UniProtKB/Swiss-Prot annotation:
It comes from the Eukaryota. Residues 20-44 are annotated as: Framework-1. Disulfide bonds join 41-115. This is Immunoglobulin lambda variable 5-45. V region of the variable domain of immunoglobulin light chains that participates in the antigen recognition. Immunoglobulins, also known as antibodies, are membrane-bound or secreted glycoproteins produced by B lymphocytes. In the recognition phase of humoral immunity, the membrane-bound immunoglobulins serve as receptors which, upon binding of a specific antigen, trigger the clonal expansion and differentiation of B lymphocytes into immunoglobulins-secreting plasma cells. It comes from Homo sapiens (Human). Keywords: Adaptive immunity, Cell membrane, Disulfide bond, Immunity, Immunoglobulin, Immunoglobulin domain, Membrane, Secreted, Signal. Residues 116-123 are annotated as: Complementarity-determining-3. Transmembrane segments: none annotated. It is found in: Secreted; Cell membrane. Its main location: secreted. Residues 68-92 are annotated as: Disordered.
Amino acid sequence: MAWTPLLLLFLSHCTGSLSQAVLTQPSSLSASPGASASLTCTLCSGINVGTYRIYWYQQKPGSPPQYLLRYKSDSDKQQGSGVPSRFSGSKDASANAGILLISGLQSEDEADYYCMIWHSSAS
């Protein structure tokens, strides 16, 4: 049985001022069911990924975005209610990026994926 490649789309956003953190994402990614996909959310220069929580959302056509997870560190992360563990977060400090890893891709994972950052001075 031949598998149709899975297409994952991303939002690119790189506008704003220094008072607003700015993110960029690749426009699309293709992968096959059963494979893994790594989605990146790169912060613009001058904004350190280490100080931010990265939030990930999935949106399917005709539906509102659904919260997947947030990730700041291994000790500061949260999985959305009912979100399978095959969705996980991490960071790449050298690339100044947050990462959403989806393992064991399934056809229902075809969607738009959005990242958002949140910075809190509270510990």
